[in-house]
Structure formats: structure tokens, C-alpha cells
From Swiss-Prot:
Pathway(s) of this molecule: Mycotoxin biosynthesis
Entry EC number(s): 1.1.1.349
Residue numbers annotated as active site: 182, 186
Gene3D superfamilies: NAD(P)-binding Rossmann-like Domain
Pfam families, A to Z: adh_short
Protein name: Norsolorinic acid ketoreductase nor1
Protein species of origin: Dothistroma septosporum (strain NZE10 / CBS 128990) (Red band needle blight fungus)
Induction section of the entry: Expression is positively regulated by the dothistromin-specific transcription factor aflR.
Keyword Translocase recorded: no
Class of enzymatic activity (EC top level): oxidoreductase
InterPro entries documented for this protein: Fungal_SecMetab_SDRs, NAD(P)-bd_dom_sf, SDR_fam
Residue sites binding NADP(+) per the record: 32, 79, 108, 182, 186, 213, 215
SUPFAM superfamilies membership: NAD(P)-binding Rossmann-fold domains
């Protein structure tokens, strides 16, 4: 199995072929991120780049995922808490793996913590959430933009996995959730992703609400609200996200906040 500094390749060796579909997913070691990696790997002639915090300890679970004919998995270090990691990861993808274009970037990595009312919310916690949930999205876009530009015309997509708690219009529905730092920083990232849409006419850039998903993060949030678990299964969420990505167009999807289930638009 070929390996490089902070990266591992499994399956068909990428050769820079522009006809292959190349996906990049952050937060890929578990939950929605891992589910998306598995789904994309099941598609023939795909290169799937799974971004994780620690390649040595987190690549095994990903390397066991089945690959379709002609598809390959690249596991690369990208810790969203490290400001230089997005640029370093892209540099390594180009130099060590001959990645010449990316068709779809999914900014999925996120944290949710510092539970409690905003009256006692520590500023340090806000800063930590802002780095992971917002600043890293900007840095990821800046790092991957040149490779997105090399995708086939009308194919490049930058997708942010958002959260319904970030909507201002419908805040009353989620107001009792003690997730001020999470909601605030997801909201800030929404602005950036919509801004990418307006500033880059060649790019589809949009937010997908994945639902309240049965992941470690989702179930923790559910318990805070007195529920046993989140209502949306991981597979339901992943299937919906993939469908929204596949059907996306510049005219109908880009610059929007879309529900994973049916693509309906959510208010900002």
C-alpha cells in the first residue's frame, strides 16, 4: 500500500485523469463524513480524498471501506484547528498524488460544545468553535479553489454541511437548545458559503442541512433536549446529501440553504 508523509492511498492509483470524479470530504473519520466517503467510493472511477486529523490512527476504518471499479481512496491529514493544514493538504495532494482537479469539496468537519446559555458562554469557547466551524471553511475554500477551477465547466461544487440551528428566521424553534457557540459559528460560515456563490460565477456553492442525525454529535444534542437519540438516521442523511449534490445546478441550488430530504430551501 503506497504511503506518503501524512497521506495514505488505497485502491486505483490516481493519475490526474480529468474524466475521473474527485471528491474531498473533511471530518471524514466518522459520522456524516465517513458516510459520505463510503458513498462516493461506491461510485466507479472516483477519487475520494478523506481528510482526517490523524492519518495513522484514523485511516484503518476508512481503508476497510469497499471501492468500486477504478476508484481510490486518499486519506490525508487536515486538522481544521491548524490554520496551515488546508494549504498543506492540497500541496501534498498535488505533489504526492498527482491531483490536478477537484469536482466536489464537502466542508463537513465541525465541533459542538460549551453547552449553556449565552450569558455564561466563555469567549475562548466561541473562538475555538469559530476556528473549526467557520475559519477552516474559508481556509479550505481558499486552498481548494485552484483545483475546483480545473473541474469540467459547470461541475465544480463547494458544499457546506450546515445546521438548522443556524437560521435566524426560525431561531425561535431552536431557541432553547444550549448551543450558542455552535449556532453562531455555523451562521458565520453560511455567510461565507453564500458569498463564494456570488463571487465565483463558475462555482456552485451551497449549504445543506443534514437533519438532526444519529451521530455522536447529533445524539449528544438530542439528550440535551431530553430525547434518547436524534431522529434522522445516518444513512438517510448521507443519501439525501448525495442526492442534493448530484442534482445541484448554479441556477437552483447555488447560494441556497437546502434541506437534505428534498432540496427545499430553508430561510437564512
Amino acid at each position: 500500500m503506497p504511503s506518503f508523509h501524512n497521506t495514505i492511498t488505497i485502491g486505483h492509483r490516481p493519475n490526474g485523469d480529468s474524466k475521473r470524479t474527485t471528491y474531498l470530504v473533511t471530518g471524514a473519520s466518522r459520522g456524516i463524513g465517513k458516510g459520505l466517503v463510503a458513498s462516493f467510493l461506491a461510485r466507479p472511477d472516483s477519487t475520494v480524498i478523506a481528510c482526517v486529523r490523524n492519518v495513522a490512527s484514523q485511516s484503518k476504518a476508512l481503508s476497510d471501506l469497499p471501492c468500486a471499479e477504478g476508484s481510490s481512496l486518499i486519506v490525508v491529514k487536515l486538522d481544521c484547528a491548524v490554520e496551515t493544514d488546508p494549504a498543506s493538504a492540497v500541496e501534498e495532494l498535488q505533489s504526492a498524488h498527482n491531483i490536478r482537479h477537484i469536482d466536489v469539496v464537502v466542508a463537513n468537519a465541525a465541533i459542538a460544545g460549551a453547552y449553556g446559555p449565552t450569558s455564561t458562554l466563555p469567549l475562548d469557547a466561541v473562538k475555538e468553535h469559530m476556528q473549526i466551524n467557520c475559519y477552516s471553511v474559508l481556509l479550505l475554500f481558499q486552498a481548494t479553489r485552484p483545483l475546483l477551477e480545473q473541474a469540467a465547466p459547470g461541475k465544480a461544487k463547494f458544499v457546506f454541511i450546515g445546521a438548522p440551528i443556524s437560521t435566524i428566521t426560525q431561531m425561535e424553534e431552536c431557541a432553547r437548545a444550549p448551543l450558542g457557540a455552535y449556532g453562531l459559528t455555523k451562521l458565520a460560515a453560511n455567510y461565507l458559503v453564500r458569498k463564494f456563490h456570488f463571487e465565483n460565477k463558475w462555482l456552485m456553492s451551497f449549504v445543506i442541512d443534514p437533519g438532526h442525525v444519529q451521530t455522536d454529535m447529533g445524539d449528544s444534542g438530542a439528550r440535551l433536549m431530553g430525547r434518547k437519540e436524534a431522529p434522522t438516521t445516518l444513512q438517510q442523511s448521507v443519501d439525501g446529501i448525495c442526492a442534493r449534490i448530484d442534482e445541484a445546478t448554479k441556477e437552483e441550488s447555488s447560494g441556497q440553504f437546502l434541506l437534505h430530504e428534498d432540496g427545499s430551501r430553508l430561510p437564512w
